[in-house]
From Swiss-Prot:
The keyword Flavoprotein does not apply. It is found in: Cytoplasm. GO terms for biological process: peptide biosynthetic process. Involved in peptide bond synthesis. Stimulates efficient translation and peptide-bond synthesis on native or reconstituted 70S ribosomes in vitro. Probably functions indirectly by altering the affinity of the ribosome for aminoacyl-tRNA, thus increasing their reactivity as acceptors for peptidyl transferase. Its main location: cytoplasm. PROSITE patterns: EFP. Keywords: Cytoplasm, Elongation factor, Protein biosynthesis. It holds the Pfam family Elong-fact-P_C. It comes from Rhizobium etli (strain CIAT 652). Belongs to the elongation factor P family. GO terms for molecular function: translation elongation factor activity. This is Elongation factor P. GO terms for cellular component: cytoplasm. Pathway: Protein biosynthesis; polypeptide chain elongation.
Amino acid sequence: MVKVIASSVRKGNVLDVDGKLYVVLTAQNFHPGKGTPVTQVDMRRIVDGVKVSERWRTTEQVERAFVEDVNFQYLYEDGEGFHFMNPANYDQVVVSQETMGDQKAYLQEGMTCILSIHEGIPLALELPRHVTLEIVETEPVVKGQTASSSYKPAMLSNGIRTSVPPHIDAGTRVVIATEDNSYVERAKD
C-alpha cells in the first residue's frame, strides 16, 4: 500500500479504506474562498458494490492499493461479462457488468484498454481518451445560426447523445472524448 495525498486521487484509482478496497468513481477538489480545501470522492466497494462518498482535506493521506495496470484487448461480450485478452501472453479476463459501468457503450472489438488488476481480479477499466464513431441521426441546422457558438444534438452509433457543430450530418464519422461524451473533431479516416 502506498500513501498519497487526497488531492492526487483520480477516477479509477483503487483505495484501501479501513481494510476494504474501493474503486474511485469520481474525485473532485473543492477550494472554498474561506476554509480548508477538500477532496470529495465517490467510490464503489469492490467486495459488494456499495457506493460510498468520502470527503478528505486535500493534504490528508489516503492509502492507495497496489494495482497493476495492464493493456488488454477487448474481444466480445456474453452472459458472463466482457471478455478481454492480454496481447502479451494471450490470457483472457472477464470483466463484470458492474465493473464496466456505463463505459460499455464505447467498447469496440479489438480496442486496447487498460485494466487495473489487483490480485488477479479486474477492478477498473480505462478506455482510450478518444473513440471514432458514426453519427446516426442529427437535427437539421436552423438557418441563421452562427457556426462559432452553436452546436446541435446528435445520436451516435453507440446510442449516446452528444452535441456536434452544424456542418456535421448523419453518416459522418467523428472523434468523441470518452470522458464526457463531447465532440472533438471530424474523423480523418
